[in-house]
C-alpha cells in the first residue's frame, strides 16, 4: 500500500484550526495590532528588529500566522533592545505595556514582552500570576553580537 499525504491549503488549515471569530483568531488579531504599534515606534526611532521562529514561518509559509500559533516572537540586537526599553513605555498607548525586568519587579525573564492590557491570559505555568501584566503578548528577544573567532568556531561544530 502506498503512503499518501494530503497537502492542505492555508484556507483549509485556518478553517480547521482557527476559524474566523474563534478565540485564537481574536487573540491573533490583537497580536497583529500590538506588532503594528511596535513597528511604528521602532521605525520612528530607527530600532531594528526581525521576526523569528514560528512567527517568521507563519509570515513566509501562510502569509500570516501558522493557523494554530498563539504567540509572536521578534528579535533585535542588544543595542536596539536597550534603546527600545527606554522608548517604548513612553510611547505606548494605555492599552499596551512593555513588560521587562525594569518595569515589573516580579518579572524574571531575560527578554521583554509587549502586553495587551485589555486581556488576561491564564497560561497555567505557575508563575504568570505574579506578573504585573498578564495580557496577550509579543515576546521581544535581545541577541548579543559575538566576536568573529567565536562565530568561526560555531560554524566548525
Where are each of the predicted segments found?
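Conserved oxyanion/phosphate-binding beta-strand-loop segments in alpha/beta enzyme cores
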Residues: 2-7
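Short, flexible loop/turn elements at secondary-structure junctions
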Residues: 53-56, 78-80, 118, 142-144
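Conserved catalytic core of two-metal-ion nucleotidyltransferases
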Residues: 9-43, 88-148
